[in-house]
């Protein structure tokens, strides 16, 4: 392959796909182009995700390749959701018009063919009604079948075109030259009603299918609806102008008023407000925004007005990345889908072979009505065979499942993780930021007698303000509102691994651990020692504040445990899942946290590389392991796990590696994600079972296997209705996932 290994991923809409074989054809066509690394078609969503090298091939060239294969790839305005919706709506309305027209004309043909077949000029009247059904309303079947034939392929349209085409041509011959049969003492049968009604019913089935498929993409539409269409921009002269969001550029200053949605990512430059960021963080409490703080597209401004500078626009915003992640996940394939694709690839040729064999067998054993039965049964075989149900079985369930996940703060990157999650029997949780809030807070303070003076609080605050230690910030946050005395601190010195020392006036003060006290010969009395040991036993870190040779205060600092942690762990245990906790903290802290949340298995003082080894060891025991983490130090373990889950407030690296991202700090979402996987996999299995059973039973029935037993032959029109019903039932079953409780 020429050119450098530059990867660009883009999702394009595909028009004209009628079945799973069409999706396979588009995928194969794109995959064969030089410069295309991978193409994944989402038949249920009528889209294709293409990973390609823009230096080797352009979207227009991709479009031409797909067009040559008989389909339409929409490359204009790929990020313009209104344009995509418009095209989809136009295609749906065109299909609706064709369906109504076909039904209106097929109805009189059906009535005449079934009840008034011997009326004068009946055959000619039916011919007059059937021609527009075939040539206009059903034209796409024949055009697409011809396009496939040119490439040596066959699809669902081929089955419809051959079956209705044969029925129509045979009927046309018998209408023009009935004497060919009457001269031999036979009746000249016509099957206009079969041809017309089959096309009408298949169009109706596709209309219902398209309507149902729209419902599977509601999650994407909801996410896209979070972004406003227009925005108020500050011009160079200071005036305001409302402009379309697509015209916003990086560096533009925008105005957001109360109740408005924030259009792009940026930084507040003027004013203040509270913003509802629940769609990004999952937290319901509005976040205060002042100058210098970030704001994100799709979040909702609540009370105040403010101006902000656009930093990320278009496809670069956090919201756009979430939408892209959901789209890519909905287009990804579950492992079972690869088997279904292989079956779909040979399905149509096999069915056409069965139809030919059916025709030959009936011609050999059919007696006086051999040709009539041979024609009807072979047409019925072609009509009843349905690769659509097979093709829709997995992707519709995946689309609905991933969409439902997005609505419940669960972003799933690929179908494989969604399919695998229900098999998880071991979950490894990182402590900091996952089980705990990830932010140390002061939980307890004990001032020794005589040290309660507010001056000492001021000294402690001023010393900790100069420290860069994470625990120092917890002390600053605790005292900054209460202390107003200004203190002059000098000779500040950091004692690595121990704490800090500083002077106020001529007195030296210490803030740190026991080692700092020992080095400076400060003795801890029995009462303070007992208190410190008790706090440490609770998993808290104790900071000692001393001055003048004695301990002035003990400050207990802990990483607060999330309110949801205990309930989530209990729910996972109820599901029979073993829960493990890993932490770099000491064993005392680890045990205290594990006891509080009900975790029986934990490992303390774990290095980042050891987390991945721990996960691997569980896998060697035969467990299917999910790893939940939020930091860069979790990325190796996330990559090693069977299912990797990142907390949405974590690092970008953790979220890049993880296949599932929780855009909330609520750990109860984890058991919900597993429940969603159960629901989705169950729907996939049900869909595949019914799709296979339908074809396994339907095709032999259509071939006439019961004729020798009870004289039953399946009517082609009933076969067409059954075929349409099978596709719609699969989509409807997938939609049930939306309404089930997690």
Predicted segments, located by residue:
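Membrane-embedded alpha-helical bundles of multi-pass transporters
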Residues: 115-118, 150, 169, 404, ...
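Conserved cytosolic catalytic loops of P-type ATPases
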Residues: 34-56, 60, 192, 221-316, ...
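P-type ATPase nucleotide-binding
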Residues: 442, 446-575, 587, 599-615
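Flexible metal-binding regulatory segments at protein termini and peripheral loops
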Residues: 1-121, 147, 222, 239-242, ...
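Conserved ATP-binding TGD loop and adjacent catalytic N/P-domain core of P-type ATPases
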Residues: 7, 24, 412, 504-506, ...
């Amino acid at each position: 392959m020429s050119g450098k290994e530059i990867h660009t991923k883009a999702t394009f809409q595909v028009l004209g796909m009628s079945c799973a074989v069409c999706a396979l054809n588009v995928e194969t066509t794109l995959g064969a182009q030089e410069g295309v690394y991978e193409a994944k078609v989402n038949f249920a969503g009528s889209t294709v995700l293409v990973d390609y090298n823009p230096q080797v091939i352009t979207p227009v060239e991709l479009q031409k390749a797909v067009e040559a294969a008989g389909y339409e790839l929409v490359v204009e305005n790929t990020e313009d959701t209104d344009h995509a919706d418009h095209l989809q709506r136009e295609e749906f309305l065109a299909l609706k018009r064709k369906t109504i027209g076909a039904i209106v004309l097929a109805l009189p043909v059906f009535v005449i063919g079934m009840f008034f077949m011997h009326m004068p000029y009946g055959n000619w009247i039916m011919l007059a009604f059937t021609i527009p059904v075939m040539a206009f309303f059903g034209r796409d079947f024949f055009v697409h079948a011809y396009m496939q034939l040119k490439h040596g392929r066959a699809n669902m349209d081929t089955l419809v075109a051959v079956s209705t085409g044969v029925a129509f041509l045979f009927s046309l011959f018998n209408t023009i030259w009935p004497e060919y049969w009457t001269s031999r003492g036979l009746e000249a049968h016509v099957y206009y009603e079969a041809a017309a009604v089959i096309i009408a019913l298949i169009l109706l089935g596709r209309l219902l299918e398209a309507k149902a498929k729209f419902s599977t993409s509601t999650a994407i539409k909801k996410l896209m609806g979070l972004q406003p269409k227009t925005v108020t921009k500050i011009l160079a002269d200071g005036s305001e102008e409302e402009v379309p969001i697509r015209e916003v550029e990086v560096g533009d200053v925008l105005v957001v008023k109360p109740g408005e949605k924030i259009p792009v990512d940026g930084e507040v430059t003027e004013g203040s407000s509270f913003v509802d960021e629940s769609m990004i963080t999952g937290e319901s409490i509005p976040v205060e925004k002042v100058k210098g703080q970030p704001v994100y597209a799709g979040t909702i401004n609540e009370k105040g007005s403010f101006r902000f500078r656009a930093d990320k626009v278009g496809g670069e915003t956090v919201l756009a990345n979430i939408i892209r992640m959901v789209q890519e996940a909905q287009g990804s394939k579950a492992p079972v889908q690869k088997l279904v694709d292989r079956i779909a690839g040979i399905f149509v040729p096999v069915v056409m072979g069965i139809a030919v064999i059916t025709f030959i067998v009936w011609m050999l054993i059919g007696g006086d009505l051999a040709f009539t039965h041979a024609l009807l049964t072979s047409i019925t075989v072609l009509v009843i065979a349905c690769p659509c149900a097979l093709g829709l079985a997995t992707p519709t369930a995946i689309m609905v499942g991933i969409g439902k996940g997005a609505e419940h703060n669960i972003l799933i990157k690929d179908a494989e993780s969604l399919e695998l999650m229900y098999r998880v029997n071991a979950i490894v949780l990182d402590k900091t930021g996952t089980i705990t809030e990830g932010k140390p807070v002061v939980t307890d303070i004990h001032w020794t007698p005589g040290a309660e003076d507010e001056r000492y609080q001021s000294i402690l605050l001023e010393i900790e303000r100069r420290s860069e230690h994470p625990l120092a910030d917890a002390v600053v946050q605790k005292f900054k509102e209460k202390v107003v005395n200004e203190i002059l601190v000098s000779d500040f010195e950091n004692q690595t691994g121990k704490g800090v020392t500083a002077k106020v006036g001529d007195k030296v003060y210490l803030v740190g651990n026991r080692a700092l006290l020992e080095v400076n010969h400060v003795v801890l009395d029995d009462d303070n020692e007992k208190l410190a040991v008790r706090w440490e036993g609770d998993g808290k870190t104790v900071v000692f504040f001393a001055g003048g040779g004695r301990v002035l205060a003990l400050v207990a600092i802990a990483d607060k445990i999330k309110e949801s942690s205990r309930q989530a762990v209990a729910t996972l245990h109820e599901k029979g899942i073993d829960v493990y906790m890993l932490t770099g903290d000491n064993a005392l802290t680890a045990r205290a946290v594990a006891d509080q949340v009900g975790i029986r298995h934990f490992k303390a003082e774990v290095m980042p590389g050891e987390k991945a080894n721990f996960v691997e060891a569980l896998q060697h025991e035969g467990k299917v392991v999910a790893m939940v983490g939020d930091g860069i130090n979790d990325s190796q373990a996330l990559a090693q796990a069977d299912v990797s889950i990142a907390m949405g407030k974590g690092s970008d690296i953790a979220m890049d590696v993880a296949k599932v991202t929780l855009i909330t700090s609520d750990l109860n979402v984890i058991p919900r994600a597993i429940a969603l996987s159960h629901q989705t996999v169950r729907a996939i299995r049900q869909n595949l079972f019914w799709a296979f059973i339908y074809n396994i039973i339907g095709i032999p029935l259509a071939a006439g296997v019961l004729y020798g037993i009870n004289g039953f032959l399946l009517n082609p029109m009933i076969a067409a209705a059954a075929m349409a019903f099978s596709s719609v039932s699969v989509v409807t079953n997938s939609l049930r996932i939306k309404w089930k409780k997690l």
